[in-house]
């Protein structure tokens, strides 16, 4: 499990398919993280069904911000990725979303929010 210290908190790193394994995120959150990055290339088919739902679930379960850059567009004649780059808050709100195409998203964040929620709802035991 890879983590890094930032000036405003600790971040963990996962990739794409890792999103389907909640225990990995639980183990990361035990490292006192406030943020998790999930760069991904979900296909259009699975992305439409699961991408935002899984991002929000991992954020809520672990009270972490999720930063999710996502590949978008047709990569080969048979493979199209879903896109939908997102920033999700620790309570599951979609703070920023870029559905398709190149671009940059940003949002105000409250680094303390993760720890505050963990005190209010002590489910990460």
Task: Name every feature range the model reports, one short phrase each.
Residues 20-105:
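CN hydrolase (nitrilase-like) catalytic-core segments centered on the catalytic cysteine
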Residues 3-5, 87, 106-108:
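Short, well-ordered beta-strand micro-motif
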Residues 1-31, 44-53, 111, 115-125:
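Active-site catalytic loop in hydrolytic enzyme cores
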């Amino acid at each position: 499990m890879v983590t890094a210290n930032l000036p405003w908190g600790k971040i963990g790193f996962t990739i794409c398919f890792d999103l389907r394994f909640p225990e990995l995120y639980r183990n990361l959150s035990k490292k006192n993280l406030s943020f998790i990055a999930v760069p991904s290339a979900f296909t259009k088919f699975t992305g439409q069904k699961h991408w935002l739902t899984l991002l929000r679930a991992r954020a809520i379960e672990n009270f972490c911000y999720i930063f999710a850059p996502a590949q978008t567009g047709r990569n080969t004649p048979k493979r199209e990725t879903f896109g939908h780059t997102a920033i999700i808050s620790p309570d599951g709100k979609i703070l920023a979303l870029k559905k398709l195409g190149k671009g940059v998203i940003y949002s105000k964040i409250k680094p303390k929010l993760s720890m505050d929620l963990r005190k209010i709802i002590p489910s990460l035991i």
